Amino acid sequence: MKLQFKHQKFQADAAKAVVDVFAGQPYLTPTYMIDRGSETRLTDTDEEFTGWANQKLIPALTDDMILERIRKIQRANQIKPSDKLEGRYNLTIEMETGVGKTYTYIKTMYELNKAYGWSKFIVVVPSVAIREGVFKSFQITQEHFAEEYGKKIRFFIYNSARLTEIDRFASDSNINVMIINSQAFNAKGKDA
């Protein structure tokens, strides 16, 4: 059985609102060198290790401009305008339970990729149960979004025992999502 997803205007509007915050940012996909650590041995067979990162915001997009765009979107949606930026562009999509938050932020990732070339996303959730639900949502929406955008997201659950996943996250130019529960940040050793 294949699930059918309807296009909901409020979900598209939420994704567009996030994309609009960064209007003026050019579409770029820069590369950078992956730091292989201090134990590297140089040989004539060593590869050049290239990784991918989201392009930094251009200097013309100042914090004041970003804040004013956020306020404009908030006013248009009858939301009390923010007094200041929270963190460095900490944007939140708030919706009622069961209306498609996960769908909306997956759509937002595709739209940010389409508009600006951004391809690295980290989803931090408060619990293992929610992490598993988010992972399942990525699985069941994969084909739907692939049909709409012509590409698939590579997603994975962070596990400190599988560091090759993080290496792939950094070295793959496609859209990549790491799903992690907040407890994993503080975990040590095998608990991470």
Spans of model-derived segments:
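RecA-like P-loop NTPase motor core of helicase/translocase proteins
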Residues: 1-192
